[in-house]
Structure formats: structure tokens, C-alpha cells
């Protein structure tokens, strides 16, 4: 019995040992299989990752095509930028700008001069009011101005002193090429102070008369550069400002009941400027412009004639000469980005006139004792040989 028990125990231990070895072998096999599967999966994922990072051959061709297109666009862009950089045409464009700028200054000075003389005449009454309109032409640039004026008479030691005020606004304008008013232009303002002994009924009229007149302008303009080949149409904004002062003495002399001759002499000062500005639109290479200004002191001498056609109609004319006592016309200066400075002395193109003639003719029709209608045409040569012509009509009521 004891041997049989020991034999069964030995067989049981052997069976348990074989079972343990089988389980261990199975675990090792499963672990090895799992390791191989994990390794294979890692390799597969690595290949997928590599495939994502490396573009296919077709994508490389597309990228090469895109690169060529980009190079063409870059070359085209470079060409587009280089086109405006035409130094010769840019300089010609600046010359045109200079000529038109000086013409605008002449135009504004002409309007100031006209307004300073537009104050109504009180005649033998105490005060007057008038409305007027006039057309201006200066070398293809033109404008229509409409205004009102008023004057009042004071008697100082039996000598009539007449003080007047006038306002002139723009109704229509075609300014020199490249210029236009920005919005509605502010009106011009004028004044006059006249010492008129002949208005005293006790005087025979043959006495020295004195006159002080003036006008002021301040307006905003938009300026567009002339377009030439391989240049740009740059645009900017600036201000035009200036004033006009005229002082003269005149001596009316009555030849007979029909004709009065009036010699006159005086001094005139005017100043007009266009502010500095830079182009802000329509350009890649902006131009920067320095202030352009002009001022003159002139001596004036001339003769006026008034002819009484009948009780209602009078004809008057005037002619004279202006001498430049001093005159300054600033050089036209501009600076183009990457091209540098341009400086234009306008004297090189048009030599200014040291003596300038002027003339006018007018007609006054007396509607009744208190009201009249007058027309006037005047002409003057500007400093740079532009002909400034004004034609106007007005109505005056005295009271």
C-alpha cells in the first residue's frame, strides 16, 4: 500500500510539473507572438508616417509649376513697378505741373483784383447795394463768379468817405489742367475805403481823390498730376491763399459837360501761394511738393476817361501800365520717392514781364435816380504772359 501511494504521488507531481512547463511555454509563445505583432504594427505605422511626409511625384510637379507661375508674377510685378520710373517723362510731368500751378496763381490774382474794384458806387446818395457776376478767361482756364457788395458814405469835415465791402463766390470754374476745387470753394472777400471830395455838392470836383482797396482768398483744391507714358496719375490736396492791396490817388478833371479825364497813380501789392502737399492717391511712387508762392510790389500809372452820352448813359475807359518794383516767383520744387529732387525755375521757360499793360471799358445805364445797370470788360497781361480777361455785369441800388 505504501509503495502504491508513493507511486501515485510521484505521478501527480510529474503531471503538475508537465502542466506548469506547458503553461510556461504557452505564455512565452503568446508573449513572443504579441511582441512580433507590436513590432509589425510599429513598422507599418512608421511606413505610413513616412508616406505622409514625402509628397508623391505628382505633387512635386504641381509645386514646380506653381513656383514657375510665382516667378512670372514676380517678374510681372517688377515690370509694373518699373514702368512709372521714367525719369524723362516724370520731369516733363513736373514741368506741366509747374506751368499749370503758375497759371492758377495768375487766375486767383485776377479774381482778387476784380473783386477789389467791384464795390458799388453810392453816387449822390448815402448808401448802395449791388449784385454782380463776371466771367474770367486766362489761357483756356475760365470761371464765372457771382457776388454782392455794399457801401456806406460818411462825411468827415465835409469830405465824403465811402467804406465798402464785397463778397464773390464761385458759380462755375474750369481751372488749369490738373486742378479743381475741393468741395464748394470759400468766397472771396473784398473791401474799399475811398476819399471822394467830388461827392460834396459844394466842390467843383477837381480835387485829389484817394482810394484803398483789397481782397482775400483761401480755398482748398485737389491736384492731379498729368499722365505721360510710364508715369502715374498721383493726386493730392492743397490750399490756395492770397491777398491783394491797391492804393492809388486820382485827380478827376472835367474838360466840359461831356468828358471827364482822370489821371491816376498808385502802388499795388499782391501775394498768392499754394501750400506744400504730398500725393496720397493713384500712385506707388508718391511726389512731394514744396510750397509755391509769388508776391509782387508794383507801381501803377494810367489815365481814365468818362464820356456822358446822354442823361442816362455813360461810357468810361481806362488804360495804364504796371511796373514791377519787386517781384518774387518761387521755384517749383518737388521730390519723387526713389528718383530724387526736381527744381524748375519758370523764368527758364517764360521770361516775366517787368512792365505790364492793362485796360478796361465800361458802360453804365441809369434806370432811375436810385438804380443803374453797368457792364465792364477789362484785360491785363499777367507776369508770365498770360492774358487775363474779365467781362461782368451788375445792378446797383442807391438809397
In which residue ranges do the predicted regions lie?
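Outer membrane beta-barrel transmembrane domains
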Residues: 187-194, 289-399
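Outer membrane beta-barrel translocator domains of Type V secretion systems
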Residues: 77-253, 378, 383, 390
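Membrane-proximal, glycine/serine-rich, low-complexity loop/turn segments characteristic
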Residues: 66, 71-79
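Solvent-exposed, glycine/polar-rich loop segments of beta-barrel outer-membrane systems
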Residues: 173-178, 220-237, 273-295, 326-353
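Intrinsic-disorder-driven secretion/translocation and chaperone-binding regions of pathogen effectors
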Residues: 49-64, 204-206, 256, 289, ...
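Secondary-structure transition into beta-strands, especially the periplasmic turns and strand N-termini
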Residues: 199-208, 253-261, 307-317, 371
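Long, low-complexity, compositionally biased polyampholytic IDRs enriched for Lys/Glu and Gln/Arg
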Residues: 2-67
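Outer-envelope exported proteins of Gram-negative bacteria
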Residues: 149, 164, 207-215, 260-268, ...
Amino acid at each position: 500500500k505504501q509503495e502504491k501511494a508513493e507511486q501515485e504521488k510521484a505521478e501527480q507531481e510529474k503531471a503538475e510539473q508537465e502542466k506548469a512547463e506547458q503553461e510556461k511555454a504557452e505564455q512565452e509563445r503568446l508573449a513572443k507572438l504579441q511582441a512580433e505583432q507590436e513590432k509589425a504594427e510599429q513598422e507599418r505605422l512608421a511606413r505610413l508616417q513616412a508616406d505622409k511626409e514625402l509628397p508623391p511625384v505628382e505633387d512635386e510637379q504641381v509645386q514646380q509649376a506653381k513656383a514657375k507661375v510665382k516667378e512670372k508674377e514676380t517678374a510681372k510685378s517688377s515690370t509694373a513697378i518699373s514702368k512709372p520710373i521714367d525719369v524723362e517723362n516724370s520731369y516733363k510731368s513736373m514741368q506741366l505741373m509747374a506751368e499749370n500751378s503758375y497759371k492758377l496763381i495768375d487766375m486767383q490774382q485776377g479774381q482778387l483784383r476784380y473783386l477789389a474794384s467791384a464795390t458799388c458806387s453810392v453816387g449822390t446818395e448815402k448808401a448802395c447795394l449791388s449784385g454782380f457776376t463776371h466771367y474770367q478767361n486766362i489761357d483756356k482756364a475760365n470761371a464765372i463768379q457771382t457776388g454782392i457788395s455794399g457801401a456806406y458814405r460818411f462825411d468827415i469835415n465835409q469830405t465824403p468817405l465811402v467804406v465798402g465791402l464785397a463778397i464773390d463766390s464761385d458759380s462755375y470754374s474750369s481751372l488749369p489742367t490738373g486742378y479743381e476745387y475741393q468741395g464748394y470753394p470759400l468766397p472771396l472777400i473784398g473791401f474799399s475805403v475811398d476819399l471822394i471830395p467830388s461827392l460834396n455838392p459844394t466842390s467843383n470836383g477837381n480835387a485829389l481823390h484817394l482810394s484803398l482797396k483789397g481782397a482775400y482768398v483761401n480755398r482748398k483744391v485737389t491736384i492731379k498730376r498729368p499722365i505721360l507714358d510710364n508715369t502715374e496719375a498721383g493726386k493730392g490736396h492743397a490750399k490756395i491763399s492770397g491777398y491783394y492791396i491797391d492804393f492809388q490817388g486820382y485827380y478827376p478833371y472835367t474838360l466840359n459837360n461831356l468828358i471827364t479825364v482822370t489821371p491816376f497813380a498808385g502802388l499795388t501789392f499782391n501775394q498768392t501761394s499754394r501750400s506744400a502737399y504730398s500725393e496720397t492717391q493713384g500712385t506707388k511712387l508718391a511726389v512731394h511738393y514744396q510750397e509755391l508762392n509769388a508776391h509782387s510790389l508794383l507801381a501803377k500809372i494810367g489815365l481814365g476817361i468818362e464820356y456822358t452820352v446822354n442823361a442816362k448813359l455813360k461810357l468810361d475807359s481806362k488804360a495804364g501800365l504796371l511796373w514791377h518794383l519787386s517781384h518774387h516767383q518761387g521755384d517749383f520744387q518737388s521730390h519723387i520717392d526713389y528718383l530724387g529732387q526736381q527744381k524748375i525755375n519758370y523764368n527758364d521757360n517764360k521770361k516775366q514781364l517787368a512792365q505790364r499793360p492793362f485796360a478796361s471799358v465800361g458802360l453804365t445805364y441809369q434806370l432811375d435816380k436810385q438804380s443803374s445797370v453797368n457792364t465792364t470788360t477789362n484785360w491785363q497781361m499777367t507776369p508770365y504772359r498770360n492774358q487775363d480777361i474779365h467781362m461782368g455785369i451788375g445792378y446797383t441800388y442807391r438809397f
